[in-house]
Amino acid sequence: SHMEIKVNFLDKLRLEAKFDDFTVIADQPIRYKGDGSAPGPFDYFLASSALCAAYFVKLYCETRNIPTDNIRLSQNNIVDPENRYQQIFKIQVELPVDISAKDRQGMLRSIDRCTVKKVVQAGPEFVIEEVENLDADAQALLTHNAATNAFTFIAGKDLPLEQTIAN
């Protein structure tokens, strides 16, 4: 299932992402010349894996009628001082004493199935390109218009995707 997110440039460094019926606002902290009026894009990225983990715990509990009132979940990202793109996402869950060992294991295993985590671990490929018309291009994407002769450049690779496959 594919989702298009359209971004609008607002005042100063504020941005607005629109998808489905939702709008998300991002800003930058004051130290980065923003107003600090909203989380930054990377903050949303970090929040997405914590929320995904909690969602999978919630699903596990719902199907087994386990109350989530006293379950607490937290995520910390530990950044490698040598390489800030090398990070450990540590997800910690605090569970009430009355939860069985079986359910404790089950909850940890369900967090492991989190979609955000799985996509990040698989290492998504980013295709960055200019288009003449976003709306027309989105339409072509939906109808899988394979009749285009456009070359798709993947950042970090020299040859267009089509030629890389051909080689």
Task: Identify the function of each model-found stretch.
Residues 2-47, 58-167:
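Extended beta-strand/beta-hairpin segments
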